[in-house]
Amino acid sequence: MFQDLHALHTRTSGRRILDLFAADLRRAERFSADLGEMRLDYSKTQIDDAIRAGLIALCDRAQLADKREAMFAGAPINETEGRAVLHTALRNLDGGPVHVDGAEVMADVRLTLARMRRFAEALRSGALPGAGGAITDVVNIGIGGSDLGPAMAVLALAPYHDGPRCHFVSNVDGAHIADTLRGLDPARTLVIVASKTFTTIETMTNARTARDWMQRGGGDPERQFAAVSTATDRTAAFGIPGDRVFGFADWVGGRYSLWGPIGLSLMIAIGPDDFDAFLRGAQEMDRHFQSAPWEKNLPVMLALTGIWHHQICGHPSRAVLPYDQRLARLPAYLQQLEMESNGKSVAMDGTALDQAAGPIVWGEPGTNGQHAFYQLIHQGKQVVPCEFMVAARGHEPDLAHHHRLLIANCLAQSEALMRGRPLDEARAIAAARGVAGDELERQARHRVFAGNRPSTTLIYPRLTPAMLGRIIALYEHRVFVEGVILGINSFDQWGVELGKELATSLGPVVDGTESAAAKDGSTAALVDYVLAHRDTDLT
């Protein structure tokens, strides 16, 4: 499948990226793709015209255009679960009808969005108060796709907050909910329980704890709880009125669900109008993905760059480095989006893959990461392709000098990764500091940077609701393109099941009501340790 590209890699792996710029003064322009004022610059990679042509050929060989059309048309492309993949319908604000199994779904999508809008507006205005007055705080309880997306987006769009404060609880560790609820008023807090099945053990454990906390503190759970779930029988049994339950269809996967009711906390924080702008930004990326030629298509070129670095060059990970503190949760969000989607070892037809599908995705916001792991990125033996992102302008005009420093650092890091520092330059630096003789050579070698390390840069005017929508949709479609080329199902997640099953069986063992004798030696010994130490007074 990749033979021609491997041959190109063999022929070009020794050249310097800097030389590509010297040979082509228009390289930055020719190896970028734009959507309006958003630009993806992938020129600081080894990709040239021949490599790009070879990568684009993968799209045609994998019938990407047909599979893209099938996804948007509601075909059951999630073959292992027999489901359509239509998170794009949730942001189809002014598009045409969308059908699943012959039924038009946009009427329900618009109805749900209108219900969310009315609920959010009433909550924000004080028309839906808690037992102690207008709601001041919202606690979203969920995990995975029910937490990572809204938590990331609420933080990212902090400059647009004009509603109640939003908090997020995901971990079943009691410390998480205890720390979150501490200081909140139980009579003026809304709790949103986000679980499609309303059975997720972490979420339901936290939900019951929050309900008890609210009842003890004078709140009214019937007025102050809402749910995002399709299990209306379970939400009713929990005590949540039907008019406060917001559902979504099984053709919306959890990690793709931010655009609908899972985004209720975001709508409450920023308001329905800005939430609409968020959806419109994503819809703009959808239309771009559907219409732009491959070489100018942002999701396609971001995906092909990823394929080149992981499948062809053999780099096992990639770092997502947003130079925006408010995007601090984006790397974790993309970890789920990419690693849960494409962390597969079996092709769509059930045969084993002959190499890893998705890479390890990790990262931190700049400039913090520069003082943590950039040492390895610059001078480690392994190459880590980096994906920088930065806005030309921040939201704090009186702190514009901060933002200029932020941009300078972002651009400097991508340049330094490419440029490096040769030994003769390192020797000159050491000599200028008064180092001489054998010590000069030793010191110089510590100051050598290999350079020639690839990176992309996503740059845009400002992080607005619409721009955040574009960014998230860009990465969603990137995952889809990579999955199509690799021949895998990007929309199931069987890898999360086994651990959940074993955790359920271990519950009684950890409680001490069942024996650990049937477990392996290590697990049994760890259980024995827990039972022996958990009641020990450590004060």
UniProtKB/Swiss-Prot annotation:
<dbReference type="InterPro" id="IPR023096">
    <property type="entry name" value="G6P_Isomerase_C"/>
</dbReference>
<dbReference type="GO" id="GO:0004347">
    <property type="term" value="F:glucose-6-phosphate isomerase activity"/>
</dbReference>
<dbReference type="GO" id="GO:0097367">
    <property type="term" value="F:carbohydrate derivative binding"/>
</dbReference>
<comment type="pathway">
    <text>Carbohydrate degradation; glycolysis; D-glyceraldehyde 3-phosphate and glycerone phosphate from D-glucose: step 2/4.</text>
</comment>
<dbReference type="InterPro" id="IPR046348">
    <property type="entry name" value="SIS_dom_sf"/>
</dbReference>
<dbReference type="InterPro" id="IPR018189">
    <property type="entry name" value="Phosphoglucose_isomerase_CS"/>
</dbReference>
<dbReference type="GO" id="GO:0048029">
    <property type="term" value="F:monosaccharide binding"/>
</dbReference>
<dbReference type="GO" id="GO:0051156">
    <property type="term" value="P:glucose 6-phosphate metabolic process"/>
</dbReference>
<comment type="pathway">
    <text>Carbohydrate biosynthesis; gluconeogenesis.</text>
</comment>
<feature type="active site" description="Proton donor">
    <location>
        <position position="340"/>
    </location>
</feature>
<keyword id="KW-0963">Cytoplasm</keyword>
<comment type="function">
    <text>Catalyzes the reversible isomerization of glucose-6-phosphate to fructose-6-phosphate.</text>
</comment>
<protein>
    <recommendedName>
        <fullName>Glucose-6-phosphate isomerase</fullName>
        <ecNumber>5.3.1.9</ecNumber>
    </recommendedName>
</protein>
<feature type="active site">
    <location>
        <position position="500"/>
    </location>
</feature>
<dbReference type="Pfam" id="PF00342">
    <property type="entry name" value="PGI"/>
</dbReference>
<dbReference type="InterPro" id="IPR001672">
    <property type="entry name" value="G6P_Isomerase"/>
</dbReference>
<keyword id="KW-0324">Glycolysis</keyword>
<dbReference type="GO" id="GO:0006096">
    <property type="term" value="P:glycolytic process"/>
</dbReference>
<dbReference type="InterPro" id="IPR035482">
    <property type="entry name" value="SIS_PGI_2"/>
</dbReference>
<comment type="similarity">
    <text>Belongs to the GPI family.</text>
</comment>
<dbReference type="InterPro" id="IPR035476">
    <property type="entry name" value="SIS_PGI_1"/>
</dbReference>
<dbReference type="GO" id="GO:0006094">
    <property type="term" value="P:gluconeogenesis"/>
</dbReference>
<keyword id="KW-0312">Gluconeogenesis</keyword>
<feature type="active site">
    <location>
        <position position="371"/>
    </location>
</feature>
<keyword id="KW-0413">Isomerase</keyword>
<dbReference type="GO" id="GO:0005829">
    <property type="term" value="C:cytosol"/>
</dbReference>
